[in-house]
Amino acid sequence: MHCTDICTCSYPAGDSSLTRMTMEAGALGFDTIVLPVEQPAVIGNVSVLPARVIETRHVREVIRDLGRTKEGQVMIVMAGDASFIRGVVPLRGVHLLAGVERQRKNAFDHVSARLAAEKNVGVTIDLFPLLYLKGLQRQRVLQRYADLLTLHRRYEFPFVIGSFARSILDQRSVREMTLLCALFGMEKEEVIRGLTSLPGVLHQLLPVRVVE
Amino acid sequence: MKPRPPTMRIKKRYVLAAIVPNYPSIDSKVLYVAIAEAITGLYGDGAGAALHHAVVFAGDGYLIARCSRGSEQFLATALAVVTEVDGQRVAFRTLATSGTIHALRRRMRQPVERPEREDLEVDGVIYEVHVRESQKVDLIEKGCNSQKLLFLVEQDLQER
């Protein structure tokens, strides 16, 4: 089982160095960690995959940024409104759609879900808000995730679960992630699939073309 | 007073968790309040009361919490969402669940004694240096209300 965690920043942007976060990920049961760094690396038994996070409101800017992608980078696009999501998901080179829980309830609907399934684009489950939000705000995030889970069960688009940690104190083990995902009704098998689905998303299978 | 017969007692389970970072000495009562808040936040007062939770041990970088049998999953989830105790940033890493405290104590490792290092200045801030196992180095800002933490490894310090 190759479990992958997604983290968002390391020292100096965060308080934990890349090596320390990677060591911690290894101790918590992960063998791959995704971080916004320049080069891939292997520290101990844990592989570091470089990622690029695109946060914009315009599809045109996403297309421009995708053109500057280096090979081997995991492209994470932060979600916007419904039209933005529908415009971004079919783009070639987009691997993950993150931050869906921050948008309105109808931003990611059945049309986007079907598109994500067709294009093999992963939708992320970010555990960071579950740790740091309280009360009504956390309830809203749990509702969004429950909605996404319903769509995932119907349309079978890839789910990618990550801690989106900014520090080693935000990283959680595979077991803890399973418990946290149970809060919005996710089964253990679904969590394991969500933690191991990134390689399938990165190696997107293109439709077969007949060349005469 | 006559003690309650064993069949009438609530069956208990104990959960062992590591406290990260392990140097702040945190009082059991403060830990209990933080965990109680997390349980109430996640499951509400009714379910929280049914958990019968308590902190039976806190020290040496570990915590042993008690709950009623069958609710250890809820307690472990609550431990996972605790991010701050008494103004200090912490994380609890659940390690094991058992029916006895003795079994959990056997799983607790004694902290490794490391030679003390001099204080270090990073970006104009003076940090206390705590060297841990596997070349891990925790830096904690010096001062009475120290909040700033840095988690590095020996190699990062050498590169500076």
UniProtKB/Swiss-Prot annotation, chain B:
This is Ribonuclease P protein component 2. Pfam families: RNase_P_Rpp14. Keywords: Cytoplasm, Endonuclease, Hydrolase, Nuclease, tRNA processing. Part of ribonuclease P, a protein complex that generates mature tRNA molecules by cleaving their 5'-ends. Belongs to the eukaryotic/archaeal RNase P protein component 2 family. Its EC number is 3.1.26.5. Consists of a catalytic RNA component and at least 4-5 protein subunits. GO terms for cellular component: cytoplasm; ribonuclease P complex. It comes from the Archaea. One of its GO terms (molecular function) is ribonuclease P activity. It is found in: Cytoplasm. InterPro entries: Pop5/Rpp14/Rnp2-like (IPR002759), Rnp2-like_sf (IPR038085).
